[in-house]
Amino acid sequence: MAIERTFSIIKPDAVAKNHIGAIYNRFESAGLKIIAAKMVHLTKEQAEGFYAEHSERPFFGALVSFMTSGPIMVQVLEGENAVLANREIMGATNPAQAARGTLRADYAASIDENAVHGSDALASAEREIAYFFAADELCPRTR
């Protein structure tokens, strides 16, 4: 198994409901280490840039509006098969279809306000990490 890094967002809905600590606990309980984190209130331009791959999709405007509606937590997670591990912790995009005990089943209200984002592959993880963090902001946990 490979030690990987993945990118995660706790979205405005979950931040507003004070679920940050509970979500971090889930990451750590699953063996993922938080090696970088910060709270950010995205500008429209930042949100559009981050989600540029969806710019032609009908939900793009609503997504940008939601992601700029309040602060978010962005973090880098490190661990065994971190990309897949985080996706399993998050659950299905639609919380109505998410397995019990996943973040979206427990903390998301709808498919639009679904509490968390996680990279879907190593390549997207690298791109998304670089969007929010400089290399010197990553703090590998060696102890």
UniProtKB/Swiss-Prot annotation:
Main EC class the enzyme belongs to: transferase
Reaction(s) catalysed by this chain, per the record, are: a 2'-deoxyribonucleoside 5'-diphosphate + ATP = a 2'-deoxyribonucleoside 5'-triphosphate + ADP; a ribonucleoside 5'-diphosphate + ATP = a ribonucleoside 5'-triphosphate + ADP
Keywords, ordered alphabetically: ATP-binding, Cytoplasm, Kinase, Magnesium, Metal-binding, Nucleotide metabolism, Nucleotide-binding, Phosphoprotein, Transferase
Tell me any Pfam family this protein matches. Answer: NDK
Residue stretches spanning the membrane? none
Protein residues bound to ATP: K11, F59, R87, T93, R104, N114
For whether the record's keyword set contains Transferase, the answer is yes
Could you name the domain of life of the organism this protein comes from? Answer: Bacteria
Q: Name one GO molecular function term.
A: nucleoside diphosphate kinase activity
One GO cellular component assignment for this chain's record is: cytoplasm
Q: Which cofactor does it need?
A: Mg(2+)
Task performed by this protein: Major role in the synthesis of nucleoside triphosphates other than ATP. The ATP gamma phosphate is transferred to the NDP beta phosphate via a ping-pong mechanism, using a phosphorylated active-site intermediate.
- Name the family the entry cites: Belongs to the NDK family.
Q: What is this protein called?
A: Nucleoside diphosphate kinase
Q: Which organism is it from?
A: Shewanella amazonensis (strain ATCC BAA-1098 / SB2B)
Taxonomic lineage of the native organism: Bacteria, Pseudomonadati, Pseudomonadota, Gammaproteobacteria, Alteromonadales
